[in-house]
Amino acid sequence: MIVDCCQCIGITKVSTYSTGAFRPEGRNDRTVIVVDIRESETAKLADIFIQVKPGGDYALFNALRAIVRGERDIIPDTVAGVERSVLFKTADILLGAKFGSFFTGIGLTQSRGKYKNVRAGIELVDELNRHTKYTLTPLRGHWNVDGTNQMFSLAAGYPYAVDYSRGIVHYNPGETSGVDILAKHEADAVLIIGTDLGAHFPRETVAHLAKINTIVLDPFISLSTAVAKLHIPVASVGLDAEGTAYRLDGVPIHVKKAFTSSMPSDEEILTRILQEIRKIKAERK
């Protein structure tokens, strides 16, 4: 809940509750830097806004990494539309922090370079950790997005783009991710669970979804259900089904159901599908 008014009645909050041990002034003790291709609402709240040219993420990360490594002489006058002096100032702020955190959005994966842009960011964070403490957290939308990555990492050792078709786990982003497989028209059947590919995947991949056997497990009607051959309504975890959700920072949270409905959960549907597949395979032997 976010409020614009807070009343303290019968209590002196400042003297009763302790402030942060390391950042007693809260927001005033923190420096927020926003990097984006345009001035967003978040950028207006930042202390420093760096406007980068579209597709310049990879170059920007590597320029900052070079500065952190002490290679200032090799930096050109501008990198991805950002002046050299701004890069030096930013690097000095990053190095001067006692504890810093990077938050990356899905925009990094939408430009040329895709996952390599994220890797460049991780390498910059790794370089900064040689001097001080830094973390990196991906910011993604929707409910429990991190849950799938956690389960894939646990079962296969990789967070996404996992291919089992070879009989062993194969991981190669750019070849085995959902977008790549659909773009190359390799898939003739797709099972979509709790997400909306129709709203977020490229147009040509969504067009392919409409041509093949697409099945959607979702509590709601979406752009994916519009192109699907079959839509199976399911219960919504946290409302009429219980389960485990992973917070943005990877912390698992068990959620209880608020009420009981007649809708089956994702787990129930997938279990029944798995049982039927095993039954069919046994009959074919």
Identify what each model region corresponds to.
Residues 1-133, 155-285:
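Non-catalytic alpha/beta scaffold blocks inside enzyme catalytic domains
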Residues 136-138:
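A short amphipathic beta-strand at an alpha->beta junction
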Residues 39, 110, 140-151:
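N-terminal, charge-rich interaction modules
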